Amino acid sequence: MRTLVRLALAVGPLLLPQLGWAAIPANPCPFSDEGVGAAGDLAQVGEQLKTAKRLEVLAVGSATMFGPEASLAPGTITSQSFGSLVNPVAPTSATLTQPPSEQAFPLQMAKQLRTLVPGLTVEVTVRGGRGLLASEMLELLHKELAAKHYNLVIWQTGTVEAVRNLPPGEFGQTLSEGAQAVQDAGADLVLVDPQYSRFLQTNSNLDPYFQALQQVSAMPGVMLFRRFDLMRGWANDGGIDLERTARSDREKAVVTLHACLGRHLARLVASSIRG
């Protein structure tokens, strides 16, 4: 089965329609409240902001969490979006140890939150790596929660499970365990679903994994950031679209994407706090 999946991934770009390259649009990521987030109330975050004006954030996920350069490395969904024939999820995973870029969307979120909430101090710790399963991220999550108190956890996951066609039930159980661990640690959780990719949508059955994320987002203190729907909306409405970006603009497009995601994620968190 894994051999067949790798073959499908390799030929995936050939199954997609021919795309015309375009420059980065003037308004790459217009803001829309509709469909950006689902469920949840970040009560712990809100209370922390009222009493201390300081937010400790743990971001756990794939290479994307470390910034544009890491997300463009061979073997990622972003590189596949640009036509790479490399299997985006290698048979073995790799935990990254370098510090995240200031352009990474979790740090861009922090930057925007400081603007939205004057006087706020935000510290972000990023953990994760390329090709990690949710179960591997859960181990990182447990380790970090035991070592330090965080107010907010951002957990980006689901792509590897979908590409490998792993049991959605096990994925959902892993998410539930992680959400409970975050709650027990006195923090709130924002889940982040896979990024939009025509390649990924063509070669994977994403729905069961989206459903698992949605179900867990109904738990207390959990929200779902609908990155996939957000990016698809931008692509369909003439906004940023990695798969149709001119080769000369690709690096700039990924930097722009991280800034857009950070801005929208900050708006989602801030609106929940005020709600």
Residue positions per predicted region:
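Loop/turn elements at helix/coil->beta-strand transitions in domains of secreted/extracellular proteins
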Residues: K53-E56, L120-V122, K148-V153, D184-V190, ...
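Catalytic His-Asp segment of secreted/periplasmic serine-dependent ester chemistry enzymes
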Residues: S197-G275
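Oxyanion-hole/transition-state-stabilizing segment in secreted/luminal serine hydrolases
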Residues: L58-V60, M65-P74, K111, T115-L120, ...
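Second-shell loop/turn segments in exported
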Residues: T64-S71, P91-P100, G131, E161-P168, ...
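Residue-level recognition of beta-strand->loop/alpha-helix junctions
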Residues: V126-G128, D193-P194, R226-D229
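N-terminal secretory targeting modules
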Residues: M1-V60, T64-Q98, P118-L120, A253-G275
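Active-site segments of SGNH/GDSL-like serine hydrolases
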Residues: Q156-T159, A179-Q211
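Extracytoplasmic/secreted envelope proteins and their assembly/folding machinery
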Residues: L42, P106, A110, L138-H142, ...
